[in-house]
Curated annotation (Swiss-Prot):
Biased composition (Basic and acidic residues): 1-10
Pathway(s) the chain acts in: Isoprenoid biosynthesis; dimethylallyl diphosphate biosynthesis; dimethylallyl diphosphate from isopentenyl diphosphate: step 1/1
Native source organism of the sequence: Halobacterium salinarum (strain ATCC 700922 / JCM 11081 / NRC-1) (Halobacterium halobium)
GO annotations of cellular component type: cytoplasm
Keyword line: Cytoplasm, Isomerase, Isoprene biosynthesis, Magnesium, Manganese, Metal-binding
Residue ranges occupied by any Nudix hydrolase domain in the UniProt entry: 56-193
Cell compartment(s), UniProt: Cytoplasm
Manner of cofactor binding, per the entry note: Binds 1 Mg(2+) ion per subunit. The magnesium ion binds only when substrate is bound.
Family: Belongs to the IPP isomerase type 1 family.
Name of protein: Isopentenyl-diphosphate Delta-isomerase
Lineage: Archaea, Methanobacteriati, Methanobacteriota, Stenosarchaea group, Halobacteria
């Protein structure tokens, strides 16, 4: 059944540690694209290595989908996630693979994680790109040059994959930024918080330091 929700829809708890170990093993078999601060490719890095120890700067994206009333669709990271498990994110976030554009990677994740297809939204646009580095407990870190993509949903139905998305809800985007005290129960992912702040404070720029499209 496809959903169009305004309140959180949480899955029942999974097996926790076992699922997390499975994800760690899966990450060890994958690569991410290592980049310079200006998002220039320097090579490939093992995904697990890029998120442990000192980390490796790599290419990533986060996507914010809105409805026609200005609400943003937030997704809760599943409890099997090793980093920022059960935290609330933008609509999707991930890493493109070698040879894949940010737009194509975003479309793929929207379809896989939420069952949202391209005919449901207008053109995806890269609205910002920034570098950040954050550690999470003793589990690892993110060190990313993160592109932000945005679009408006004309058909707000979706069908989340509980292995990836623990819950989903619509939130007034402006209210979330201006009144964070009302949303204290939502632990937000750092990359989403940065993207939202830059969006409202006028810092969003899809070209890092004005040097690259």
């Amino acid at each position: 059944m496809r959903d169009s929700m305004s309140e959180a829809d949480r899955s029942s708890p999974g097996s926790g540690k076992t699922d997390r170990e499975d994800e760690t093993a899966e990450n060890a078999t994958q690569d991410v694209i290592a980049v310079t601060p200006d998002d220039e490719r320097t090579g490939l890095a093992n995904r697990l290595d890029a998120h442990t120890g000192d980390g490796v700067r790599h290419r990533a994206f986060t996507c914010l989908l809105f409805d026609e009333d200005g609400r943003v669709l937030l997704a809760q990271r599943a409890d099997r996630k090793r980093l920022w498990d059960t935290h609330w994110d933008g609509t999707v976030a991930s890493h493109p693979i070698e040879g894949q554009s940010q737009v194509d990677a975003t479309r793929q994740r929207l379809a896989e994680e939420l069952g949202i297809e391209p005919h449901q939204y207008d053109k995806l646009e890269i609205t910002d790109r920034f570098e950040y580095k954050r550690r999470y407990l003793d589990e690892g870190l993110e060190w990313e040059v993160c592109a932000v993509l945005q679009a408006t949903l004309h058909d707000t139905s979706f069908d989340r994959d509980p292995e990836e998305v623990g819950g989903a809800m619509w939130v007034d985007y402006e209210d979330l930024y201006e009144n964070p005290r009302y949303y204290r129960q939502l632990r937000l992912c750092p990359w989403f918080e940065i993207a939202m702040r830059r969006d409202f404070e006028g810092d969003a720029d899809p070209v890092p330091d004005g040097t690259r499209a």
